[in-house]
């Protein structure tokens, strides 16, 4: 009976050690998220600009996505498209287009706070996120 218990305990310890070794063996991806083109400080009503973000990785990612984010959704500056997404790759150029919809004069500071949030997902559940913020004035 004690041999059986001892062998079960030994097997559990071995499983725990092997899990640690296998986890430590997987190198972390080196991910670079770079803003290539942002929004101007001032836009006129009706103007559109595209934010471009480059993603580069030394390992293949499962997906990369860029999404617009607003403090005042639907006012001042709005997204023309809902974002951009690419599948499995090691690099990507993500684009989000914005349009100046209305004046920001009545908003706090006279600007519309707008952001682009980029996420890169890897196998195993690792996610790398970067946020690029802009304050755009629309006279």
Where are the predicted features?
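Short acidic, flexible loop segments centered on an aromatic residue
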Residues: 58-74
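Proline/serine/threonine-rich low-complexity linkers at boundaries of modular beta-sandwich domains
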Residues: 19-33
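Short beta-strand elements
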Residues: 125-139
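Short glycine/proline/serine/threonine-rich loop/turn segments at secondary-structure transition edges
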Residues: 102-113
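Aromatic sugar-binding surface patches on proteins
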Residues: 88-99
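Short beta-strand and strand-turn-strand segments in soluble, beta-rich domains
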Residues: 31, 70-83
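Short beta-strand segments of immunoglobulin-like
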Residues: 37-43, 83-84
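Structural beta-strand segments of beta-rich domains
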Residues: 47-51
């Amino acid at each position: 009976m004690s041999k059986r218990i001892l062998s079960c305990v030994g097997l559990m310890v071995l499983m725990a050690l092997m899990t640690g070794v296998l986890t430590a063996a997987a190198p972390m991806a080196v991910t670079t998220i770079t803003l290539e083109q942002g929004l101007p400080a001032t836009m006129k009503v009706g103007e559109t600009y595209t934010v471009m973000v480059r993603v580069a990785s030394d390992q293949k990612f499962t997906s990369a996505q860029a999404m617009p984010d607003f403090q005042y959704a639907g006012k001042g500056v709005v997204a023309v498209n809902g974002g951009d997404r690419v599948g499995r790759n090691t690099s990507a150029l993500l684009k989000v287009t914005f349009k100046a919809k209305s004046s920001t004069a009545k908003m706090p500071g006279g600007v519309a706070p707008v952001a682009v949030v980029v996420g890169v997902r890897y196998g195993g559940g690792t996610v790398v996120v970067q946020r690029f913020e802009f304050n755009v004035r629309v006279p």
